[in-house]
């Protein structure tokens, strides 16, 4: 092996290595007409010689490994070869992979930039991996080097003539291997001898492990509530496992038995790319009704707790606990319906009471009932109408012990008293209240057909406090408040709507000033309604008035020393004096 040594640069700037390389390559090229080298043209025409030349040509520019007789291995780019009697080659960017002693070289990561010449007497073999030998492969590699070309599927299938992938087969365990269904405790089996990596490292290598489980997991605080937390965690886990799923893989992991109606392979079944989003619901062994029952049980377990206690699988204490929870839940549901009916009736009562104005309440000194009693009577009437409207809902809502309805004569008497009171006050009302009075009377007459509760029950319902705020106080109207009635004379009459005034401001002409060459033009007076007016309280010199456009910029008027400033005058409108303030207690 004689490597080519680096030589200094020549005087013309080119290195001697280039000329030596070109001279050696010229001597290495065979010539058919040259017979001085000891071989003739017939030796090149042999099939083995042609095949060797073809393989050598295919290796040019590819990464190869060259094995020598002394055991050394070089790796580099195949650059040139001498196909004459001896088969010497030249490697470019060659590096030593393995020396003659069989040890790997440390200079593998630092490839040499030299041209390495290997004579034929030291060469054993040349190994080239992934070398294209067919013309199709060469054309494919050349076409794939074009990054700007758009490659379609059909074009790619024509380029790469590769073998088809082998068909996947399902894994079948050997018969002598035991079945380990539980992989969590696989090392606890007796045939595994309880293998522990920390003990093995300590026994074999003397290494003491510093592994702390609390650094990677959540530390469980043992206490009186630990058992309840574990039961709750197991219940949530059972709910998750018992949920319905549309994924075949998840269903199999949860232990759901699937029938053999799936005509798909194992790859499609467990692949994440070609996942099956839907499958037939009849794949389960249970029918559709049992599946719905399981789904309802999951919802009930999530809301009221585990339902396994009702089946007798849990201890007696647990069953009693769930039985109490079911009873409490039913009680809460009944109370919720009662509160809902009470809130709806109370809402209806407030809505109808808000329609009646404050004039329905009597004035102080009247022998009719006060305002609070009247409000309670109205509330009891509407509550009775809402409670006794649907008798079928009484047993569900918990009103089995409600008192019987009051006689119609008693109802008609009370509502007649209210209607008479409303009519008497409507006669003394002011003119603008006739429409609202008619609507209120119609509402009162329509409410006269509704039954009410007894006075005792209505009083108990009206005296209840809100369940939202225990410290809330009951709101009652002030019975000593005086009703406010505005007098017709104090009200301001509504004047007809005046048309929108679009006029301009008119000013009297400015008197002539001595020495002023600029004169203001005057025009005729603008007819129509003229207010507001701006004028000077001085003697006008001309009947004409100067016109100022409202959209034009206004400039100050030139004034004489003795001239007074213009005054803006607004004509007063006839109005009556306002109502005097009588104080806070008068309302």
UniProtKB/Swiss-Prot annotation:
Sequence motif PAM2-like 1, location on chain = 467-475
Motif PAM2-like 2: chain residues: 476-486
Extent of Polar residues compositional bias: 486-498
The keyword Nucleotide-binding is assigned to this record: no
Q: Which UniProt keywords apply?
A: Repeat
Task: Kindly indicate where the leader peptide sits in this chain.
Answer: none
Q: Which InterPro entries does the UniProt record give?
A: ATXN2-like, LsmAD_domain, PAM2_motif, Sm, SM_dom_ATX
What GO molecular function annotations does the UniProt record carry, in alphabetical order? RNA binding
Q: Could you list the residue ranges that cross the membrane?
A: none
Identify one Gene Ontology CC term for this UniProt entry: cytoplasm
Compositional bias annotation for Low complexity: 431-464
Q: Give me the ranges of the annotated region Disordered.
A: 422-503
Q: Where is the Sm domain?
A: 51-132
PANTHER family registered for this protein in UniProt: ATAXIN 2-RELATED, ATAXIN-2 HOMOLOG
Domain notes, please? Contains a tandem repeat of a PAM2-like motif, which seems to be involved in the binding to the PABC/CTC domain of PAB proteins.
Protein name, please? Polyadenylate-binding protein-interacting protein 3
Name its species. Arabidopsis thaliana
């Amino acid at each position: 092996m004689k490597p080519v040594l680096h030589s200094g640069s020549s005087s013309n700037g080119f290195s001697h290595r280039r000329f030596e390389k070109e001279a050696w390559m010229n001597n290495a090229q065979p010539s058919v007409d040259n017979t001085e080298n000891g071989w003739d043209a017939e030796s090149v025409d042999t099939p083995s010689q042609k095949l060797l030349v073809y393989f050598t040509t295919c290796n040019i520019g590819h990464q190869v490994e060259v094995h020598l007789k002394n055991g050394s291995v070089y790796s580099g780019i195949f650059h040139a070869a001498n196909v004459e009697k001896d088969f010497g080659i030249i490697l470019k960017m060659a590096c030593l992979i393995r020396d003659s002693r069989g040890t790997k070289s440390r200079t593998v990561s630092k490839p040499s930039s030299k041209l390495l010449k290997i004579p034929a007497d030291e060469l054993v073999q040349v190994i080239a991996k992934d070398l294209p030998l067919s013309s199709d492969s060469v054309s494919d590699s050349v076409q794939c080097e074009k990054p700007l070309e758009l490659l379609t599927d059909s074009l790619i299938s024509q380029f790469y003539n590769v073998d088809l992938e082998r068909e996947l087969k399902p894994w079948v365990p050997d018969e002598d291997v035991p079945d380990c269904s539980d992989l969590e405790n696989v090392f606890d089996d007796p045939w595994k001898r309880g293998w522990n990596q920390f003990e093995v490292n300590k026994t074999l290598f003397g290494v003491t492990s510093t592994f702390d489980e609390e650094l990677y997991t959540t530390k469980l605080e043992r206490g009186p509530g630990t058992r309840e937390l574990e039961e709750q965690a197991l219940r949530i886990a059972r709910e998750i496992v018992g949920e319905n799923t549309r994924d075949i893989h998840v269903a199999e992991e949860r232990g759901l038995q699937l029938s053999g109606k799936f005509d798909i392979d194992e790859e499609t079944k467990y692949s994440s790319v070609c996942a099956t989003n839907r499958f037939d619901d009849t794949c389960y062994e249970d029918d559709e009704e049992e599946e719905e029952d399981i789904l309802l049980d999951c919802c009930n377990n999530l809301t009221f707790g585990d339902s396994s206690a009702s089946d007798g699988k849990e201890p007696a204490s647990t069953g009693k606990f769930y039985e109490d929870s079911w009873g409490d839940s039913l009680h809460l549901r009944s109370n919720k319906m009662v509160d809902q009916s009470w809130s709806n009736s109370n809402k209806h009562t407030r809505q109808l009471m808000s329609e009646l104005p404050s004039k329905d309440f009597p004035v102080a000194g009247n022998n009719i009932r006060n305002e609070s009693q009247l409000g309670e009577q109205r509330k009891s009437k509407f509550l009775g109408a809402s409670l006794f409207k649907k008798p079928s809902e009484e047993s569900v809502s918990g009103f089995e012990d409600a008192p019987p309805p009051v006689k119609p004569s008693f109802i008609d008497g009370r509502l007649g008293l209210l209607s008479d009171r409303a009519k008497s006050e409507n006669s003394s009302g002011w003119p603008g209240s006739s429409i609202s009075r008619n609507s209120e009377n119609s509402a009162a007459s329509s409410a006269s057909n509704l039954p009410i509760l007894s006075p005792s029950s209505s009083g108990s319902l009206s005296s209840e406090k809100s369940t939202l705020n225990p410290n809330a106080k009951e709101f009652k109207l002030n019975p000593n408040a005086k009703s406010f009635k505005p007098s017709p004379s104090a009200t301001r009459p509504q004047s007809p709507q005046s048309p929108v005034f679009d006029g301009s401001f008119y000013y009297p002409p400015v008197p002539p000033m001595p020495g002023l060459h600029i004169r203001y033009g005057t025009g005729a007076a603008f007819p129509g309604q003229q207010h507001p007016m701006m004028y000077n309280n001085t003697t006008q010199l001309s009947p004409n008035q100067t016109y100022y456009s409202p959209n034009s910029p206004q400039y100050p008027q030139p004034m004489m020393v003795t001239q007074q400033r213009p005054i803006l005058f607004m004509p007063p409108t006839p109005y009556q004096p306002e109502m005097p303030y009588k104080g806070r207690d008068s309302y």
